[in-house]
């Protein structure tokens, strides 16, 4: 285990999960069956972090200590073995077979699951209709989910599951255009309900905090501060700060990472801002391979991002955005958040005791607007008749739980 965790820290991959392990000061072993983690500061959420893939146990022989493993093969201690099928340097199918050496607590209800990867949601939906696959999830478009809800297809069931994914706008807070008053004015104008309803239908709902409503500690911090969308109030914010209008900048989004509705969402945001007369915003989409490095480099004044939590705790919706080594590489700093409230919240073993700290953190975000929450999503799984365990097949943090799937009548 020491090797597995230490290598994640040492490799420090730019897009990796090292942030979850940033509080580790030292790792030592005691005998053959004990690992001791020394933390820099107290952290009641650390056991949750050890339960994520960031701390997954991998064999030394296949996983070098200072470098990522090459290729697509994966070895570990989980409930399945994995065999990828590769075409033109890209994985197109993965076969998961029950691991005879697995010693964990999960009850695996199937012997094998095959996963096909599709270029888009249309191709995936077509494969389900043609009975080439038995189940689809994650990248299902709002249109597909709505169609299945309104006009159910024979032989296909649609299951709604709790979702903890969020969508938000991020800002380079050092950019001279998107100053705090400008960000506050955007928060005052944007109509989240219209965006969620018009673009995503039943698959999303408005979000007024970084912490979604289904997580303990949530408050409607943005609604409490700004209320209903108001161009008049936004104009007062800008006028008081001496900001010349219309404010001009480009709002960036990734065209291929979060699903087909992203472009429509950002067109709706653009229309709302520009219709106020206070903004003249253009939008631009980039492929994720270009988008993410440019966003982290600070090339974008304003941009859209999504977040799938690593574990269902308010810490995972605040620290990754507000800590020094934050996920966005944002220049925004709040000393109160970073030095006082986040450490205070992590000291509370009883997570309900951290509610006051999280309320203050959400209020800081609503006031400074380093990020601007837009919506929180629901999860849907479409499956063909005869597949059981679908309601448990995807966790609240959007992780596949393939071991729950089975065919009782097969």
Region annotations inferred by a language model:
Residues 206-241, 257-264:
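Structural transition elements
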Residues 97-101, 161-185, 189, 198, ...:
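A bilobed periplasmic-binding-protein/Venus flytrap-type ligand-binding module shared by bacterial periplasmic
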Residues 16-62:
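Surface-exposed binding/hinge segments that line
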Residues 51-107, 112:
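Gly/Pro-rich hinge or "lid" segments in bacterial periplasmic/extracellular proteins
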Residues 91, 239-309:
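Ligand/substrate-recognition segments at binding pockets and active sites
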Residues 1-13, 36, 177:
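Aromatic- and charge-enriched surface segment that lines or borders ligand/interaction sites
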Residues 8, 26-28, 83-95, 114-174, ...:
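Extracellular/periplasmic solute-recognition and catalytic clefts
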Residues 190-218, 261-270, 292-410:
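Detector for C-terminal structural segments
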């Amino acid at each position: 285990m020491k090797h597995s965790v230490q290598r994640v820290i040492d490799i420090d991959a730019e897009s990796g999960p090292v942030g979850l392990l940033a509080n580790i000061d030292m790792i030592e072993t005691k005998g053959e069956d004990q690992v001791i983690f020394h933390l820099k500061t107290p952290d009641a959420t650390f056991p949750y972090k050890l339960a994520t893939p960031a701390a997954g146990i991998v064999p030394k022989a296949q996983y070098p200590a200072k470098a990522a493993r090459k290729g697509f093969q994966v070895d570990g201690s989980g409930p399945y073995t994995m065999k990828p099928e590769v075409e033109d340097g890209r994985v197109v199918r993965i076969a998961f077979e029950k691991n005879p050496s697995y010693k964990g607590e999960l009850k695996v209800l199937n012997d094998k699951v095959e996963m096909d990867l599709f270029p888009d949601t249309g191709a995936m939906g077509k494969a389900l209709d043609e009975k080439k696959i038995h189940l689809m999830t994650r990248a299902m478009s709002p249109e597909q989910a709505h169609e299945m809800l309104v006009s159910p297809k024979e032989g296909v069931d649609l299951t709604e599951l709790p979702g903890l994914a969020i969508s938000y706008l991020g800002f380079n807070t050092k950019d001279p255009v998107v100053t705090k008053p400008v960000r506050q004015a955007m928060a005052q104008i944007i109509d989240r309900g219209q965006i969620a309803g018009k673009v995503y239908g039943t698959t999303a709902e408005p979000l007024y905090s970084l912490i979604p409503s289904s997580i303990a500690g949530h408050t409607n911090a943005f609604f409490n501060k700004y209320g209903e969308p108001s161009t008049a109030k936004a104009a007062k914010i800008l006028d008081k700060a001496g900001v010349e209008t219309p404010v001009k900048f480009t709002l960036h989004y990734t065209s291929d990472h979060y699903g087909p509705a992203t472009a429509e969402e950002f067109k709706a945001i653009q229309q709302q801002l520009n219709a106020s007369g206070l903004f003249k915003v253009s939008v631009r989409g980039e492929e994720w391979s270009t988008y993410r490095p440019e966003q982290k480099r600070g090339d974008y004044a304003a941009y859209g991002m999504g977040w799938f939590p690593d574990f269902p705790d308010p810490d995972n919706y605040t620290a990754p955005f507000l800590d020094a080594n934050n996920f966005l590489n944002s220049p925004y700093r709040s000393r109160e958040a970073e030095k006082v409230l986040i450490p205070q919240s992590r000291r509370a073993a009883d997570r309900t005791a951290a509610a006051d700290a999280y309320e203050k953190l959400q209020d800081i975000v609503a006031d400074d607007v380093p990020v601007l929450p837009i919506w929180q999503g629901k999860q849907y799984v479409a499956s063909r008749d005869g597949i059981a365990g679908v309601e448990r097949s995807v966790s609240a943090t959007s992780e596949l739980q393939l071991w729950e799937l089975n065919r009782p009548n097969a």
